[in-house]
């Protein structure tokens, strides 16, 4: 895997070439660096193979859908949904949307830099959502051979604003609202009913939403 062009860079041993006319010290330094690069790539591949064996997936698929966000391994939301749908224990995940009307004014917590303390501090702000609809999403499905419906906790635009996800710089909640609702609802569903499939790891979107300087 570490020598393949099909795997992401985290799993690939991208070795440095020796420059022409390099002295012994330079050659020794580059060889040592290449050894470290190769060791790290192989170690990452071994972790991916171990994760793949635990969730019954292809190692290549795991490598292509597991990313490191802020130093923590995270799943692609699409891959997590596909894993639930293909595990054989559940019917495919479905999503129910409910429009709860205008969002209105919503209090939320933001973090601003305080030059006196040299750190970010939590402050309460108010979001004007009078022109935005509060949409709620629930992920649900049933176990194979059972009629009992398994539902996630509801995720809504109001929740996204209150938690600060909607207002973060670069947030996709404002441009891909329904998609983000689906991704977060699917993650909540998996954590509740099949945590072994995610192995306790958050999704890429979750990590990007909840990361603050306090973590």
Residue ranges of model-derived segments:
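Polyanion-binding surfaces on beta-sheet-dominated domains and ring/shell assemblies
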Residues: 1-215
